[in-house]
């Protein structure tokens, strides 16, 4: 469930951009595909829904023995929900990361080469989940 039950009788055009995005994701789940190709599935969603949507996607992949190839521009989402990250630039492939098994000290140099000086740290949520947080260090402060 993507949380749109109360809008089930509404026309697609009546939904907000975020609700449309969730509706399209739900349609993808119903098709039970084993390979999902998703271009920024969280793009029209607010902060909370971005994380919930990526959690739904990760659960779908696990329960359906599926794989998802997802483009994301938010490194925090990628670091917390993707098993493998291919870090790209206009010049091509910069590197590959495995956030759940690679030590933070090995990920920071590659991410710093893209975003400038950053540091990674872990945070525990109220639900006891671990989150990897990327902090951009401002050289002007």
Residues of each region from the PLM?
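H-loop/switch region of ABC-family ATPase nucleotide-binding domains
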Residues: 72-73
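Helical segment within the ABC ATPase nucleotide-binding domain
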Residues: 51-63
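Conserved beta-strand-loop-alpha-helix hinge in the C-terminal portion
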Residues: 88-117
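Helix N-cap at the start of a conserved alpha-helix in ABC-type nucleotide-binding domains
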Residues: 47-49
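Catalytic Walker B motif of ABC-type/P-loop ATPase nucleotide-binding domains
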Residues: 36-40
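Conserved ABC ATPase "signature" region
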Residues: 1-7
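Conserved ABC ATPase signature
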Residues: 11-15
């Amino acid at each position: 469930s993507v949380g749109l039950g109360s809008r089930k009788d509404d026309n697609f055009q009546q939904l907000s951009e975020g609700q449309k995005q969730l509706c399209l994701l739900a349609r993808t789940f119903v098709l039970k595909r084993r390979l999902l190709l998703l271009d920024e599935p969280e793009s029209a969603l607010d902060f909370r829904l971005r994380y919930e949507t990526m959690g739904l996607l990760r659960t779908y992949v696990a329960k359906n023995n599926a794989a998802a190839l997802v483009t994301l521009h938010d490194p925090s989402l990628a670091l917390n929900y993707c098993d493998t990250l291919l870090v790209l630039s206009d010049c091509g492939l910069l590197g590959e990361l495995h956030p759940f098994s690679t030590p933070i000290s090995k990920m920071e140099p590659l991410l710093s080469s893209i975003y400038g000086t950053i540091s990674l740290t872990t945070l525990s949520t109220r639900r006891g989940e671990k989150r990897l947080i990327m902090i951009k260090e401002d050289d002007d402060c």
